[in-house]
Amino acid sequence: MSKIALKKIEFGGVALQIPEVWTVVTESYTEPDGRECAMIDISAEEGDPRSIVISYGPMPEGSDAFMEASDTYYELIGDTGAEAEDDPVCEYDFLGTVGFGFEVPTEDNLACNFICAEVGTEGRSYLFTILTTAKEFEDIDDLLDLVEQEISFK
């Protein structure tokens, strides 16, 4: 099996290596509460539905990764009427910490996974979110493995 050539992207305090044929769009943005954040939007080659969207910035005051994942779920999906013990947000071992997220198919029937994790650098708490999309959920695992192996924070 041949080794895939990687390229390094550095933006907003995140460094990551991805396949060199993939497309990257970066953006800085300000949340309504004034936090400055960075977004890295990565797409595979045309015709390949795999994508990774990373957001990274200071943790919102009074929040944590679980609250952020839950809020995102209910913002995107809404209240399904499920019982509390059927909470769709689950734990992930991600980036050496506990992340929280959920899986949901897209309108195009692609697999989609969203994870929030709290990462710390220089004694500060940061919110790291990752949205991955692929043809199958098994491909999502490969994308998450790639990120975990190739990411670093500044």
Mark where each language-model region is.
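Short, acidic/polar N-cap/turn motifs at the starts of alpha helices
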Residues: I4-K8, G13, D87-V89, C116
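Acidic/histidine-enriched, beta-strand-rich ligand/metal-binding domains
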Residues: A5-K8, F102, N113, E138, ...
